[in-house]
Amino acid sequence: GDAERGKKLFESRAGQCHSSQKGVNSTGPALYGVYGRTSGTVPGYAYSNANKNAAIVWEDESLNKFLENPKKYVPGTKMAFAGIKAKKDRLDIIAYMKTLKD
Protein backbone atom coordinates (compact mmCIF):
# COMPACT_ATOMS: atom_id res chain seq x y z
CA GLY A 1 0.00 0.00 0.00
CA ASP A 2 0.84 3.68 -0.33
CA ALA A 3 1.35 5.13 3.16
CA GLU A 4 1.24 8.77 1.99
CA ARG A 5 -2.11 8.25 0.29
CA GLY A 6 -3.18 6.20 3.30
CA LYS A 7 -2.46 9.12 5.64
CA LYS A 8 -4.85 11.36 3.69
CA LEU A 9 -7.49 8.61 3.66
CA PHE A 10 -6.99 7.99 7.38
CA GLU A 11 -7.48 11.68 8.14
CA SER A 12 -10.64 11.91 6.03
CA ARG A 13 -12.20 8.53 6.89
CA ALA A 14 -10.98 7.82 10.45
CA GLY A 15 -9.71 11.13 11.84
CA GLN A 16 -13.06 12.31 13.20
CA CYS A 17 -13.16 9.42 15.68
CA HIS A 18 -9.56 8.18 15.95
CA SER A 19 -6.28 9.88 16.79
CA SER A 20 -2.98 8.82 15.23
CA GLN A 21 -1.13 10.22 18.29
CA LYS A 22 0.16 8.03 21.08
CA GLY A 23 -2.22 7.80 24.04
CA VAL A 24 -4.85 10.19 22.65
CA ASN A 25 -8.24 8.49 22.78
CA SER A 26 -11.26 10.18 21.22
CA THR A 27 -14.67 8.77 20.27
CA GLY A 28 -12.62 5.73 19.22
CA PRO A 29 -9.34 4.45 20.67
CA ALA A 30 -5.98 5.93 19.64
CA LEU A 31 -4.62 4.05 16.63
CA TYR A 32 -0.97 4.82 17.30
CA GLY A 33 0.75 1.44 17.58
CA VAL A 34 -2.35 -0.42 16.38
CA TYR A 35 -0.45 -2.66 13.95
CA GLY A 36 0.48 -5.85 15.80
CA ARG A 37 -1.62 -4.92 18.86
CA THR A 38 -4.41 -7.12 20.25
CA SER A 39 -7.94 -5.71 19.92
CA GLY A 40 -9.47 -4.06 22.95
CA THR A 41 -6.21 -3.24 24.76
CA VAL A 42 -5.64 0.55 24.57
CA PRO A 43 -5.41 1.87 28.16
CA GLY A 44 -8.18 4.23 29.18
CA TYR A 45 -10.60 3.37 26.38
CA ALA A 46 -14.01 1.81 27.14
CA TYR A 47 -14.29 -0.92 24.52
CA SER A 48 -17.35 -2.98 23.69
CA ASN A 49 -17.24 -6.50 25.08
CA ALA A 50 -17.10 -7.68 21.46
CA ASN A 51 -13.78 -5.92 20.84
CA LYS A 52 -12.32 -6.90 24.21
CA ASN A 53 -13.29 -10.54 23.79
CA ALA A 54 -12.34 -10.87 20.11
CA ALA A 55 -8.59 -11.05 20.90
CA ILE A 56 -7.75 -10.17 17.29
CA VAL A 57 -4.16 -9.21 16.50
CA TRP A 58 -4.34 -6.26 14.12
CA GLU A 59 -2.25 -7.24 11.10
CA ASP A 60 -2.76 -7.01 7.32
CA GLU A 61 -5.54 -9.59 6.99
CA SER A 62 -7.48 -8.69 10.14
CA LEU A 63 -7.31 -4.93 9.52
CA ASN A 64 -8.36 -5.45 5.89
CA LYS A 65 -11.42 -7.49 6.91
CA PHE A 66 -12.36 -5.12 9.75
CA LEU A 67 -12.01 -1.97 7.62
CA GLU A 68 -14.13 -3.57 4.89
CA ASN A 69 -17.06 -4.33 7.22
CA PRO A 70 -16.46 -3.72 10.95
CA LYS A 71 -19.83 -5.03 12.17
CA LYS A 72 -19.51 -8.24 10.15
CA TYR A 73 -15.94 -8.93 11.31
CA VAL A 74 -16.59 -8.04 14.97
CA PRO A 75 -20.34 -8.38 15.63
CA GLY A 76 -21.23 -6.09 18.52
CA THR A 77 -18.45 -3.56 17.92
CA LYS A 78 -19.48 -0.03 18.79
CA MET A 79 -17.63 1.33 15.76
CA ALA A 80 -20.43 3.04 13.84
CA PHE A 81 -18.72 2.95 10.46
CA ALA A 82 -20.06 1.22 7.35
CA GLY A 83 -16.64 0.20 6.09
CA ILE A 84 -14.38 0.96 3.15
CA LYS A 85 -15.34 -0.91 -0.01
CA ALA A 86 -12.26 -0.12 -2.15
CA LYS A 87 -9.50 -2.63 -1.37
CA LYS A 88 -6.75 -0.20 -2.49
CA ASP A 89 -8.03 2.39 0.00
CA ARG A 90 -7.95 -0.21 2.80
CA LEU A 91 -4.44 -1.34 1.90
CA ASP A 92 -3.18 2.26 1.76
CA ILE A 93 -4.70 3.03 5.17
CA ILE A 94 -3.10 -0.13 6.59
CA ALA A 95 0.27 0.93 5.12
CA TYR A 96 -0.10 4.26 6.94
CA MET A 97 -1.15 2.56 10.19
CA LYS A 98 2.07 0.53 10.09
CA THR A 99 4.01 3.82 10.36
CA LEU A 100 2.27 4.80 13.64
CA LYS A 101 4.85 3.40 16.03
CA ASP A 102 7.91 4.31 18.10
From Swiss-Prot:
Region (Disordered): 1-26
Locations listed in the record: Mitochondrion intermembrane space
SUPFAM superfamilies per the UniProt record, alphabetical: Cytochrome c
Keywords carried by this UniProt record: Acetylation, Electron transport, Heme, Iron, Metal-binding, Methylation, Mitochondrion, Respiratory chain, Transport
Residues with PTM N-acetylglycine: 1
Feature: compositional bias, Polar residues: 17-26
Entries under Pfam families matching the protein: Cytochrom_C (PF00034)
Role summary: Electron carrier protein. The oxidized form of the cytochrome c heme group can accept an electron from the heme group of the cytochrome c1 subunit of cytochrome reductase. Cytochrome c then transfers this electron to the cytochrome oxidase complex, the final protein carrier in the mitochondrial electron-transport chain.
Protein's name according to its UniProt entry: Cytochrome c
